[in-house]
Amino acid sequence: MTFLARLSSSTGDLSTKLVDYVQLTKPRLILLFLITTAAAMEVAGQGRVSPQLLLITLGSGTCAAAAANTINCLYDRDIDAVMERTRHRPLPAGRVAPWEAVFLAVLLAITAFSLLAAFANLLSACLAMAGIAVYVGVYTHWLKRSSPQNIVIGGAAGAIPPLVGWAAVTGELSWAAWVLFGMIFVWTPPHFWPLAMLIQEDYARVQVPMLPVVGGDRVTAQQIFLYTLALVPTSLLLVYPCGVVSWGYGVVAIALGSWFIYRAWQLTQAPAERERARRLFKFSILYMMLLCAAMVGDRLLLPHLSAGLNALGALLK
């Protein structure tokens, strides 16, 4: 084999390995965490967050979430090898060794903590580590294989990114930060359970007691509906009593929440209809993205609108 051929082969192997490492981190899951983090930062900073702090916090959040997801893949590699949708992942497929996953996770966690501690503050760095600990210790290790409430309690890990973002900007956690935490916490079950309904056969095969497996479709649909009912008033707490966003955001939150409730109600009418569960799962993602966009838009646009109206009023005097 010529030198160029060996070089080409090595480059190809490295490229494949990097792709496997990225797959370990579940990048599609991370995007939504970053959106909620950025929204929390803009609300906390009232639309005046420095681009440097925003980029560092989002980069650190990416590393922290990637570390947690990598450890999750490592721990679950036995059941991933059995489940149809996960058996081709790098660890169960044998493309990545367990020690590589451990090394990658530790490196990512250290990077996340170091960046936040150095360029934001210690509180945000510790919160990021707490997110990893809750996801790995509470959800993955303790609850996922033992309780149908696994995603409810363990879902607290997914609600920590807004706390990290808020703390990075302010150095503290106000009531508004905890409302953001509560919003993600309440949103997680009606987001995840429709997906669990779609793949419940896989969960049953590996004896993971997700609610659709243990309680059935009807009970799951009813629980989803109850959580969506609780989500709308929770999202409005940012308007009152917290007062960190205006009723411009509130109108969007009511509209999105009403449609979410309607979609969830539709599922209760036909719990076994998989297409309704699929549509609800997809809408839950869109709901959170648009809600965060409404927060950011409210904080970025409202001050300029107020200034413009004041200037217009001065001209008309």
From Swiss-Prot:
The keyword Protease does not apply. It is found in: Cell inner membrane. It is an enzyme of class 2 (transferase). InterPro entries: Protohaem_IX_farnesylTrfase (IPR006369), UbiA_prenyltransferase (IPR000537), UbiA_prenylTrfase_CS (IPR030470), UbiA_sf (IPR044878). GO terms for molecular function: protoheme IX farnesyltransferase activity. The keyword Transcription does not apply. It is a multi-pass membrane protein. Converts heme B (protoheme IX) to heme O by substitution of the vinyl group on carbon 2 of heme B porphyrin ring with a hydroxyethyl farnesyl side group. Pathway: Porphyrin-containing compound metabolism; heme O biosynthesis; heme O from protoheme: step 1/1. This is Protoheme IX farnesyltransferase. It comes from the Bacteria. Keywords: Cell inner membrane, Cell membrane, Heme biosynthesis, Membrane, Transferase, Transmembrane, Transmembrane helix. It comes from Thermosynechococcus vestitus (strain NIES-2133 / IAM M-273 / BP-1).
